[in-house]
Amino acid sequence: MARRALPGIDCVEASIGHPSGPPEWKPNPSDTQVIFHQIIDWSDAYANAPNIPGGDRWPAAWVQPAQAYRDALQAGARAMLDISYGERARNRFDLFSPEGRPKGLVVFVHGGFWKALDKSFWSHLARGSVESGYAVAMPSYTLCPEARIAEITREIGAAIARAAAMVEGPLFLTGHSAGGHLVTRMISATSPLPDDVRARISHTVSISGLHDLRPLIKAAMNAELHIDEAEARVESPALLAPMQNARVTCWVGSAERPEFVRQNALLANIWTGLGAKTCVIEEPGRHHFDVIDGLADSDHQLTRTLLSP
């Protein structure tokens, strides 16, 4: 796993220890780091809002800044909304353009556990990349339970291919939570993307991504997701090989639920051994809902990392 010096942010490798000795074995805190992972309630493990002070403010807190950004870019003829990429009602994406010719294309895939929200909540997060000279596409997709996760994977592949046909240059993929799963799925060996589109992908940043779907089978939300063991095995990036020359940064807030921190390190740990260039970043003090805020700022390390060559 690559280590990169980022001002104020540590790019770290996971260090997970498990006691293997008799019951009386105790670690020496002076030279041993031991992290125990024991989860009894998988629904609580993924419950963000109840575990964030004021967490009930989201997602409503994103609506106004997203609308204001869309309005501003529409006024300058730099926003194309509801571009079709498929036949289903939610197969639409918005495209935001910089002033002048784009240097390339960023695609942001939203979260919501594959079952909630749409592209309209996140428009303001395009600002950092747009101000850096890149076009930004933000797709919606059919939600669970109307669609299975495997279908959503194919839809995101179609959205990226359509957007890539409209904007020349390198591609940068990023997504949050379920969106982190979907963008890393795009750079797995079984990606639905055409070869020519895959070849253009320069960097992928999974923000608080869910890379192993198997634990979600045990969560209450699976009543809507309908994940089974078979689907989890073919749709979990951590259980798949990365595509050739994959480069991925796994980014998470240090104040997130421990399960998101674990899932964040998980993909980088596994894909490093399979030949991918990987990095793990825990942004100090960030929780699940504000960890994405840096995308709105061209000078923030999250945007700079995403667009790094």
Named regions from a protein language model:
Residues 158-220:
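Primarily recognizes the serine-hydrolase "nucleophile elbow" in alpha/beta-hydrolase
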